[in-house]
Structure formats: structure tokens, C-alpha cells
Amino acid sequence: MMGQNQTSISDFLLLGLPIQPEQQNLCYALFLAMYLTTLLGNLLIIVLIRLDSHLHTPMYLFLSNLSFSDLCFSSVTIPKLLQNMQNQDPSIPYADCLTQMYFFLLFGDLESFLLVAMAYDRYVAICFPLHYTAIMSPMLCLSLVALSWVLTTFHAMLHTLLMARLCFCADNVIPHFFCDMSALLKLACSDTRVNEWVIFIMGGLIVVIPFLLILGSYARIVSSILKVPSSKGICKAFSTCGSHLSVVSLFYGTIIGLYLCPSANSSTLKETVMAMMYTVVTPMLNPFIYSLRNRDMKGALERVICKRKNPFLL
């Protein structure tokens, strides 16, 4: 009987964003512009790091993977949202919904681990500059990236398999713009306690601990910089750390609020807005905060442009 109930749901209906019909076109144009900005910004970073040998360093290895993760993270949800806004067809097949959830978790978790690796890289570079090359060896950097991919793959698969075992009966309306894990659990008509416990326990390992490690790394960085009597260096460091921490806090804060500390009286509108912060806004901001405004990336862009104009220039 349970298997029959589960297979009775062949698709889900995504309600999308709670916007008025007269605002549909404006919102579509806005989200399309944000998505294209995310794609172009992150693709530019990946291409520049690939083409410029000056950027073949640990920090830019992490940045290129972060850009790829951001690009994919947005592509998991935004194209479907834009499609639904255009053709007014909110349905998504059951298998596609679980697939979307899997890749959403995969690239979201991957970003979490990569942000930790980048914070550690900056911590070593600023606090132990003389030992940076020895500590951040190519083997360690590749191992950190590979470990991030492996852990996130298994974590996303765990949640997807746990979700696939649940039964979904009559209600197939998801009050969200993508197949969110918490929204799907609310629709299940079977026991979800195992899923909820796994979310809470694994969430602490995947989200809370990385967030605390990042805060600790930047705290040590600030402490180290304050010991140097240079007002210009202090201002620059606080500007950089402040911008990084603002994006990190936006990403982790919304995820912790939604999945680990959900409010009993939280509205669908509030949850949707919070989800937009880390699915749309953060991937769009990351290229500008971490890469495109720094001197190395600007220099790489100039060198690539010069080579295009003069192919014989070394």
C-alpha cells in the first residue's frame, strides 16, 4: 500500500514566487539579468584562471572551483524558475524533482567546503607568509578540493535516497520555486523523523562547523593584521575581510535559519526570500567580492586582452 501511494505521485507542482501577475515580466527580466550576471562573472573567472599562468596558485584553484560551483548552483534552480514564469507550467516530474534536490545539495555543500578552504588559504598566507608555499602545497590543495567533492557527493546522495524512500500521497503542491528538501518533507505522508535527524546532524557538520572555521580564520587574520602598525594595511584588510564575511554570513545565515533553526511561525514568503538570498544573490556576488575586483584578476584580464590584440606578444 505504501509503495502504491508513493508511485501515485508522478509529478509535483512548483508554486514559484509569490508575485502579482502584473509584476511577472519585471521579475522575469530581473532574475534573467541576475542569472546571466552570475553565469558571465563566474565563467570569466574560470577562463582567466585557466589561461593566465600567474593565477595558477592555491587561492585561484579554490576560486575556480567556487566559480564552477556557483555557476552550477544557480543553474540547478533559476532556469526552471524562469521557464515556469514564461510558460505558466509549474509541474516537475517526481524523478526530476529528486534530481534537482540532489544537485542543489551537491553544489550548495561544495560551496560551503570551498569557502572554508579559501579562508584557510588566506589565514596561512597572512599569518604564516614565510611558510605559505610549504604548507599550501599542490598536493594539499588538490586533496582539499577532491575531498570536498567526495564528501558533498555522498552527503547529497544520502539525503536524496532518504527522500526517495518516503511516500507522497495526495498533496503534490510545493510552495516554493524549486524542490526544496524541507518543503518536500512537509508533503510526505510517511514518517520523516529519520530525515529530520539527518538534516540536523549532518547540517551541523556541513554548515555550522565550516561557518565557525571561517569566522575563526578571519578572526586570526584580523588579529594578525592589527599587530602591524599600518593604517592603510588595516583599512584594506578590514575592507576585504568585511566584504568576504558579509557574503559568507548571508550564505550561511540563511541556510542555518531555514534548515537548522526553522521558526514555527515562518511564512512561505519569508522562506522564499531567504532561499533567494543564497540561491540567486550569493552566487552573483561571489565573483565580484572574491575575484573580479582584485589586482591579480584585473592584471590577468589585461594580459588576456593584450594577447588577443597581439598574438605574438609573450
From Swiss-Prot:
- Keyword tags: Cell membrane, Disulfide bond, G-protein coupled receptor, Glycoprotein, Membrane, Olfaction, Receptor, Sensory transduction, Transducer, Transmembrane, Transmembrane helix
Top-level taxon: Eukaryota
Indicate where this protein is primarily found.
Answer: membrane
Q: Disulfide bond: is it a keyword of this entry?
A: yes
Transcription as UniProt keyword = no
Membrane-side (Extracellular) residue stretches: 1-25, 80-100, 159-195, 260-272
Q: Which InterPro entries match?
A: GPCR_Rhodpsn, GPCR_Rhodpsn_7TM, Olfact_rcpt
* Topology term for the membrane: Multi-pass membrane protein
Q: One short Pfam family name for this protein?
A: 7tm_4
Q: Where are the transmembrane segments?
A: 26-49, 58-79, 101-120, 140-158, 196-219, 237-259, 273-292
GO CC, alphabetical: plasma membrane
- Which cysteines link up through disulfide bonds? 97-189
SUPFAM superfamilies, per this entry? Family A G protein-coupled receptor-like
User: Which segments sit on the Cytoplasmic face?
Assistant: 50-57, 121-139, 220-236, 293-314
List the PANTHER family: OLFACTORY RECEPTOR
The family this protein is said to belong to: Belongs to the G-protein coupled receptor 1 family.
* Stated role: Odorant receptor.
Q: What protein name is recorded for this chain? A: Olfactory receptor 1E2
Name of the gene encoding the protein in the UniProt record: OR1E2
